[in-house]
Amino acid sequence: MKPFTVHKGKVAGIDRANIDTDQIIPKQFLKRIERTGFGKFLFYDWRYIDGEKPNPDFELNRPENEGATILVANENFGCGSSREHAPWALQDYGFQAIIAPSFADIFYNNCLKNGLLPIRLAKQDVEYLLRESTKADYELTISLEDQRVYDDSGFERTFDIDPYRKQLLLKGWDEIDLTFVYEPYIAEYEKKHCPMS
């Protein structure tokens, strides 16, 4: 994973609640275990008509949202079945952060474990961001170090994140990387407490 410290990027909004993981990445695309190649299937049933032609009415297909790296959505984002493919698809598409009033717990944790930053903001703040996201080239800056989200027009909010998860994201580590960092201590512990016969 790459470290997440400060990110400034274009915002795309999907003003829908209860977007489930099957809408994020439909089940027929879950047959692979690589983390890449899922972006083209993100929101597949909404993005394409008959699986081929881009749907001009879907938010991410609008020209002003091309290149967006921050997604804003409504309540209960990522509900439904647990699948790591959902954050993989969002990342592979180009998103680095998701902002919503609430997330399904399992999806929220899957995002953090895979280096995608989920940010909870108050409903009225998300509504403001959804309105602003309809403007061409609307951008937000996210500072994980300061736990702040802000734009160039004076909007600024702080957000909460578990300190442990924050440190992993800042360093670009997953839990396997953390195990490697502590490997000498683990080996020493095993040597003291589990001697070989």
Curated annotation (Swiss-Prot):
GO biological process: L-leucine biosynthetic process
Pfam families from the UniProt entry: Aconitase_C (PF00694)
Gene3D superfamilies assigned: Aconitase, domain 4
Keyword line: Amino-acid biosynthesis, Branched-chain amino acid biosynthesis, Leucine biosynthesis, Lyase
Keyword Amino-acid biosynthesis: yes
GO MF term list: 3-isopropylmalate dehydratase activity
Subunit structure: Heterodimer of LeuC and LeuD.
General function of this protein: Catalyzes the isomerization between 2-isopropylmalate and 3-isopropylmalate, via the formation of 2-isopropylmaleate.
PANTHER family membership: 3-ISOPROPYLMALATE DEHYDRATASE SMALL SUBUNIT, 3-ISOPROPYLMALATE DEHYDRATASE SMALL SUBUNIT 2-RELATED-RELATED
Protein name (Swiss-Prot/TrEMBL): 3-isopropylmalate dehydratase small subunit
Source organism (scientific name): Geobacillus sp. (strain WCH70)
Protein encoded by which gene: leuD
